[in-house]
Amino acid sequence: RGAIVALDPNNGEILALASAPTINPNDYLNTKLRSALINDSIARPTYDRALQGTYPPGSTFKMVTALAGLQMGTMTEKTTYVCKHGFRYGRMHIGCHCGMYYTPQGLEHAIGKSCNNYFSEAYRDIVRKDPNDYSVGINEWASILNSFGLGKFMGTDLPVGSKGLIPTAEFYDNRFGEGVWNPYRIIFNGMGQGDINTTPLQMANYTAIIANKGFFYTPHIVHSIDGKPLTDSTYMVKKNTLVDPKHFDIIQRGMRNVFTMGTARSFDTSSFVQFGKTGTSQNSHGQDHSLFVLFAPADKPKIAIAAIVENGSWGTTYAGPMASLIAELYVTDTIKRPALVQRMKNGNLQGEYRRQWIDYLKRKGLYVEPVKKDSIGNKIDSLKFKKDSTKLKHEPKQITKRN
């Protein structure tokens, strides 16, 4: 289960749009199958995850946090934070595995190693831009993210979609009460968790924006009509974000670090230069989701990809290798990593999905524990027999009195 979206950063054309599980349209001809497909609330095969599915983007969102901070002036390219095995505030502790502890760490390195502390502190400073009014910082942050197409409909030429969620001060005033909340209550937003929700299409689009250093074209699937190129200005006019182009260079270097010395170094390749970011999205209903965003090549990027595998665990487990292989085939017209292809083909998450199905049945009170009748049933019967025979063996004889 999951989705993959690939865009051409140069024009916004959707190169690939995949959602799984897939269905055979002919199944709708069968009344029983049609009903089963529509009512399947677990696998949801009729649900377009690429356009409608909303997920916390996890660490793939950290670059966007940094870009907002750079534009707002709450941090610079030289800003460092000290990771103490994660972010700490009072009794709160957000763990981190960046490996660079108790020493100043810069932005470029923090992206490569995916330091949770760095982007938590960066987000805290964003919200605290005006220490006397947190709404100033969070609303400016939200406006910048809206300019990336986040928190609103993308306006594609497809009939469905989701806005996702980018929270504002009003959102938290309604939840906690006006003036009650503070940066620490919403700190997980900085890492793409908390209340952040995006679609795979939106993730691919903000990756294209980073590739373009600040602009994008509205994603669309139509290339031409009756052989004539698309002329609709909705899809042909460049849209600039609120982030200055100068802030994107360090972000791109950090995304390259992800492959050279960071979390994706296990599937880097010499065939082409790729820039990416791993993500692991926490999921309260089962194993974490595996996410990855990528653009390539270095000179005039041709493709931007977002991949999510539901319950796929780490971003490097499934989503990362899948995105990298797609980019390799598109950029080089060949794949030189057959072992990685085979590993993806052999991957299987049916055990995790089966566990979720059993949990669902238990919540509904419909689960029946399986019983192996041949082995367990006979064993129980034999035990009963032995117990009865033992009882008879030691039972005292009755004495009948004669009249």
Predicted features, each with a name:
Residues G2, P9-S59, V64-G315, I358-K364, ...:
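Beta-lactam-recognizing serine transpeptidase/beta-lactamase-like catalytic domain environment
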Residues Q202, A319-M322:
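Helical mechanochemical/support elements of P-loop NTPase systems and associated helical scaffolds
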Residues L7, N11, A327-E328:
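Hydrophobic, aliphatic-enriched repeat segments that assemble into extended interaction scaffolds
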Residues L230-K239, M322-D388, K393:
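Short, gly/Ser/Thr-rich active-site loops of penicillin-recognizing serine hydrolases
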